Amino acid sequence: MNKYKKIKNNFDKEKKSYIVGFLFSLFLTIIPFFCTLNHLFSRKINFFVILLCALSQIIIHFIYFLHLDFSKKNSWNIISLLFILIIVFIIVFGSIWIMYNLNHHVIL
């Protein structure tokens, strides 16, 4: 197999991965819109449907667009992702904690 065919096969495989990821993402975006616009479920169930679709979409993006998997080759990428998630967790929940305490201690 010459170099051109190897590159073309790799490109076709990557293009297929992007198309599958896009279709999954599109499907996971349409489901919450359909459920909320047509009032299929109660508000609580709609919230959980939206949350489940959002978490599924995050996983789909990690797998199909960022190409993250648990192989030894990607171990540094996984470690970097975990570090970023910890930092985002600290920033978001720290901000919520600070705003709650500010709201609690404000004299009206």
Curated annotation (Swiss-Prot):
Residues 1-16, 68-77 are cytoplasmic. GO terms for biological process: aerobic electron transport chain; electron transport coupled proton transport. Coiled coil: none annotated. GO terms for cellular component: cytochrome o ubiquinol oxidase complex; plasma membrane. Residues 38-46, 99-108 are extracellular. It holds the Pfam family COX4_pro. Keywords: Cell membrane, Electron transport, Membrane, Oxidoreductase, Transmembrane, Transmembrane helix, Transport. It is a multi-pass membrane protein. It comes from the Bacteria. The chain crosses the membrane at residues 17-37, 47-67, 78-98. One of its GO terms (molecular function) is cytochrome bo3 ubiquinol oxidase activity. Cytochrome bo(3) ubiquinol terminal oxidase is the component of the aerobic respiratory chain of E.coli that predominates when cells are grown at high aeration. Has proton pump activity across the membrane in addition to electron transfer, pumping 2 protons/electron. Heterooctamer of two A chains, two B chains, two C chains and two D chains. Belongs to the cytochrome c oxidase bacterial subunit 4 family. PANTHER family: CYTOCHROME BO(3) UBIQUINOL OXIDASE SUBUNIT 4. This is Cytochrome bo(3) ubiquinol oxidase subunit 4. It comes from Buchnera aphidicola subsp. Schizaphis graminum (strain Sg).
